[in-house]
Amino acid sequence: MNLGVIFGAKSFEHEISIVSAIVLKNVLKQGLKFIFCDANRDFYLIEQKDMRANFFSSGKYKNSKKLSLAKGGFYTHSLFGANKVECDVIINLIHGMDGEDGKIAALFEFYGVKYIGPRLEASALSYNKELTKFLAQKAGVKALDYEMLTRQSEPKFHYPIILKPARLGSSIGVSVVHDDSELAYAKDVAFEFDKDVLVEPFIKGVKEYNLAGCRIDGKIKFSIVEEPKKKEFLDYEQKYLSFSNENKVKEAEISEELKQKLKFNFSKIYDCGFDGAIIRCDFFVIDDEVYLNEINPNPGSLANYLFEDFESTLNALANSLPKEREIKIDYKFINSITSVKGSGKL
């Protein structure tokens, strides 16, 4: 199977997406087609040998073949016409805006392109942190209390609190606030990236666990459970470095009971429309209860480091994607009206 990877795009997480794509190139043994979307939303076909960070930061990518998106996939163009880039399935590896907000999913659906990634509705629900709270409630999964903050309003929670832009990942614009003296700056940072800011109580020392998975042939394939290294929280630079990880992580040393609880809650989230995607859910465990922290619909490097057999999982998912319902357009209704009217003026 020929797999393609689309990455980059007009997003605050553009550079993290580049790192994710480079990692995927190094992790997967099979050849991949790399499709770069730059900040102007122009598409380029990138050679494997050019998949280096400075190839993009220097602007050299502009010398690559330019692509257009049309029915069935991406195309190069020459004096002799258009040639389709041979990709059976394209992996959506765009982080943040354009990739996780549903834009690229909508384009792929419209043009009939098979892809690995969240569908439009799932993208919208997981991209916006407030909508994710509604999704968790609907799924019967616990989540922390929250409030939405405006520039003029003050948080009602007791300190410490955490401020998060509603539509960003990778810890961009996120701040932990311990007292009034830190609040104004944290608000300025968060509102620089989004007009909507979510506030949650910050629970120091809470247990955190990450679990990824996807549905293959009707059954969810789970990754191992990871317990991330403890810091107050992972900032952008630490997330950037974690996305460049090509090594498998150590499985969390937890009870079988807790492992099953995490899988049960993951399944309830995944069943809310994430078929066709590898997602990662980040959970808190408080007083033996599992709480959803956030959904990563396009996790860094597709969370390859959490799977013992990532390449076979990816290929199996590519063969188990949701199928769009076929709709036959036969114009029977119009023909029946015109035949009755007899004038043909409709």
UniProtKB/Swiss-Prot annotation:
Where in or outside the cell it occurs: the entry states: Cytoplasm
Positions of the ATP-grasp domain: 133-326
UniProt enzyme class = ligase
Q: Which pathway does it take part in?
A: Cell wall biogenesis; peptidoglycan biosynthesis
Catalyses which reaction(s): 2 D-alanine + ATP = D-alanyl-D-alanine + ADP + phosphate + H(+)
Name the UniProt key words of this record, in alphabetical order. ATP-binding, Cell shape, Cell wall biogenesis/degradation, Cytoplasm, Ligase, Magnesium, Manganese, Metal-binding, Nucleotide-binding, Peptidoglycan synthesis
Spell out the PROSITE patterns in the cross-references: ATP_GRASP (PS50975), DALA_DALA_LIGASE_1 (PS00843)
- What does the entry comment about cofactor binding? Binds 2 magnesium or manganese ions per subunit.
Q: What does this protein do?
A: Cell wall formation.
> What's the protein called, per UniProt?
D-alanine--D-alanine ligase
Which gene name belongs to this protein?
ddl
